[in-house]
Amino acid sequence: MGTWKNKNSNKKNRVSYISVPAQIINSVSSSSLHKFLDNKSSKKNTSKFFFNLRNPKLWAFSLFLLSILGISLRLGLCLSHFGSGDHESQLQSSDSNGSPKSHMGFAYIRSSTTQVEISNAKDRSLDMGVEKNETFGGHQSHLIIPNGNGHDDKNYDFWKQPDGLGYKPCLDFSIEYRRESKKILVERRKYLMVVVSGGLNQQKIQIVDAVVIARILGAVLVVPILQINLIWGDESEFSDIFDLEQFKSVLANDVKIVSLLPASKVMTRPSEDGSMPFNASPQWIRSHYPKRFNREGVLLLRRLDSRLSKDLPSDLQKLRCKVAFEALKFSPRVMEMGTKLAERMRSKGPYIALHLRMEKDVWVRTGCLSGLSSKYDEIVNIERIKRPELLTAKSSMTSNERKLAGLCPLNAKEVTRLLRALGAPRDARIYWAGGEPLGGKEALKPLTSEFPHLYNKYDIALPLELKPFAKRASIMAAIDYIVCKESDVFMASHGGNMGHAIQGHRAYEGHKKIITPNKRHMLPYFVNSSLTETEFEKMIKKLHRQSLGQPELRISKAGRDVTKYPVPECMCNQSNTTI
């Protein structure tokens, strides 16, 4: 605040105070300010001129100063607003549902309770080993992004997507198929019920085949019944996991689907059959099942897992793809949760997804050993002796023979060496799906040591976010499926139904990169101590040159599943490039 003394011969000395905004004071140098306030050497007549309230020049000058002050303040406010708006635009965006997001990428409502959750999430991210500037949802990538591709020159080859050779989805059914559809869709005499069992991806395979069988029989399909999983106690119904309306509407021109039997047939006991052989053909189904429908026209099938032949006529192969990739979508709430986690993983650039098969029962079933220590080998061997029925085929082979034959899952150490050899950057963000590994955190130590940014769904979910799905193993698996499918690079340590399903889905959506470990040929190099690291990496890259998700013809080998290899039945070549 500045102070002026005004002398008047008729009045006592008075002190006048003028408030000056801090912005103006700060913008004036101290020397100038000192002169402006305390310069007593100014001429008295000048001082009298300024403080004569009756002088019109004073009013004009005052208005001029006020105008300058107003412009300065307005300009300052505009600049302040622009700066804060730009900052907020970086810290806050909207998710797919229109909800605001914090700078961590988590959807939230502006309430004190939720702000506490966000704060807790920040603390959790630090506990997980995430650096302060690497909270989930940040908009600045930790990777250099030339041309918007999410990688620098050094890591370009690893993140580079395979050449899809112009293949795109095309489900053009034949004239004969469409003609038959008109007859089938008016059918009301035969109803097919199916009970599907196993884990999520086993259920999906059976649902796909159930639709195809209903089409072959010309029957109405009742929405499949999901058998309660005795191991996990999952009581989810079809509509809990999958989008029922999507399922019905997409297949409306292929198979008539109803949620329940008609009232006239509800009380009837369906004819039940579980004798379908492996590799059953459409001819076998047409000759065997029509006579199995009961008097009311209801047939119940069980144990469909991998029974229907993988080699079907082209139209039925297209129908398989239509069910697997277009009709069988996850329910809205499952999709929302999975998509949200995928967005958090991608918030700082591209990410890798791994499906790790390191659970105790996997080592027992495969006849392999984890490679952790003799302690864990003994645990697996004891369990295998107790339950010999769990061991899969080729039980005469030793665990070492199985490993060298490429029949064993990769352990964390092998996964780490493979990723490093293929050029995965150390700062790559990795999402891993799968059950609790035998050995817990110790089993994952080789991975976390080399790739510190390793997360699963529990690491990146907000507190209580996964609680509604806590006892729903199939829904948890569906969330993993979504995050893995949306990744930039995917790899399964041991094939399996989920790995195969994701491989086919990623191919159908544009041949996104998948690493298929060439276990049988690469493991000898893993134990060859005479190789330098450079030589090792060169050999591993050479082995996997054609195993990175490029289009591959299903018909090149008999018995391949079209939902894993959708070319050529379900995808057309738009560029006339041959495989």
Swiss-Prot record:
- Which Pfam families does its entry note? O-FucT (PF10250)
What residue intervals traverse the membrane?
58-78
- Top EC category: transferase
Keywords carried by this UniProt record: Carbohydrate metabolism, Fucose metabolism, Glycoprotein, Glycosyltransferase, Membrane, Signal-anchor, Transferase, Transmembrane, Transmembrane helix
Q: What is its EC number?
A: 2.4.1.-
Q: Which residues are glycosylated?
A: N133, N528, N573, N576
What subcellular compartments does it reside in? Membrane
Q: How does it sit in the membrane?
A: Single-pass type II membrane protein
Positions with a binding annotation for substrate: H355, L356, R357
Q: For this UniProt entry, which residues form the secretion signal?
A: none
Q: Which Gene3D superfamilies match?
A: 3.40.50.11350
The parts of the chain that form a coiled coil are none
Q: Which family does it belong to?
A: Belongs to the glycosyltransferase GT106 family.
Question: What is the name listed in the Swiss-Prot or TrEMBL entry for this protein?
Answer: O-fucosyltransferase 24
